A protein has these predicted regions:
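Alpha-helical scaffolds flanking conserved acidic
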Residues: 58-71, 115-124, 141-147
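Short low-complexity stretches enriched in small and charged residues
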Residues: 2, 20-27, 78-82, 105-115, ...
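Acidic/His-rich, divalent-metal-binding segments that scaffold phosphate/diphosphate chemistry
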Residues: 1-96, 138
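RNase III-family endoribonuclease catalytic core
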Residues: 121-129, 133
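Divalent metal-dependent phosphate-bond-processing catalytic cores, especially two-metal-ion Mg2+/Mn2+ enzymes
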Residues: 2-8, 34-39, 43, 47, ...
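Hydrophobic/aromatic-rich structural module bridging two neighboring secondary-structure elements via a short loop
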Residues: 78-119, 131
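Alpha-helix boundary/interfacial micro-motifs
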Residues: 66, 90-91, 123, 163, ...
């Protein structure tokens, strides 16, 4: 994939990188609802990364680096949608493919002329969608891996509140709320565990898994953003739960998550 470079400066320059990104998007159908959702999401993650960098009191270079990582974190999604018209993980590992585009095809140089930060950027993007973040030991790399994971989840709160359910769930609110929650999903969520993608079966399993994202947030500052925006209650109450056991579980989960978000101590 060739992108005409508009970068001339040897530093982290977000505005120039954004111009390259906009040019990259010209290869895809912006009118496609799923593509547009991911474009909006990308810039939402940039905004959340910027806010986290501010709250974490990062220096200028790390703040700029966080924004660049956010801009590029889902670059593999667009090719996934072009080929498969799907976000499902069984169609493509979008994080790995994003790394392939950037670092195997050399596209990263179009966004960041210097290779100084390649190791940080590559690891953060490669690991941003891992079920659990493990094996990253270098302090600065770990910082940015945590920031992008949290920023991604924080913007996904906006997605779950405002985007068309048919676009990312394939069903309307009534149908989602009428389905059961699998026992393993119910148990894991109420025990404070993240949900493994492969364990999800029903529509409600998927919905619960999005709420269980909160358990995986790394920073107290991220949980503060969740609490300030009342994301737990607002996301839960977007769906009318008509299946009796589902309704009961969601009431329990709401109480547990509200308490967790308020009390949890993080890095």
């Amino acid at each position: 994939m060739k992108i005409d470079s508009v970068l001339k400066m040897s530093k982290i320059d977000y505005n120039a990188a954004r111009a390259v990104f906009e040019n990259y998007l010209n290869s895809y159908d912006r009118k496609n609802d799923k593509v547009w959702l991911k474009i909006v999401h990308t810039y939402g993650v940039v905004a959340e990364s910027t806010e986290l960098a501010k709250r974490l009191r990062l220096g200028e270079e790390d703040a700029s680096l966080a924004r660049i990582i956010a801009l590029l974190h889902d670059i593999g999604r667009f090719e996934q949608l072009k080929r498969y018209d799907s976000f499902m993980p069984d169609t493509m590992d979008h994080a790995s493919f994003g790394v392939h585009i950037l670092f195997r095809e050399g596209v990263i140089r179009q966004f960041v002329p210097e290779d100084t930060w390649d190791g940080i950027i590559e690891t953060a993007i490669a690991r941003h969608s891992d079920f659990v973040l493990e094996g990253v030991t270098e302090e600065r790399v770990l910082l940015h891996a945590r920031i992008i994971r949290d920023a991604d989840k924080l913007d996904n709160c906006r997605v779950k509140l405002t985007d068309d359910l048919m676009t990312f769930m394939g069903a309307d609110a009534g149908k989602i709320g009428s389905t059961a929650i699998s026992e393993k999903i119910r148990k894991d969520a109420l025990e404070g565990k993240s949900i493994l993608s492969a364990d999800r079966v029903t529509l409600m399993d998927y919905w619960v898994s999005y709420l269980a994202y909160f358990y995986d947030l790394n920073f107290r500052e991220s949980l503060d953003i969740v609490e300030e925006n009342d994301y737990v209650r607002r996301i839960i109450h977007r769906i009318p739960y008509t299946e009796p056991n589902t309704k009961k579980t969601m009431e329990e989960l709401e109480k547990r998550l509200v308490r967790y978000v308020h009390e949890a101590k993080k890095v």
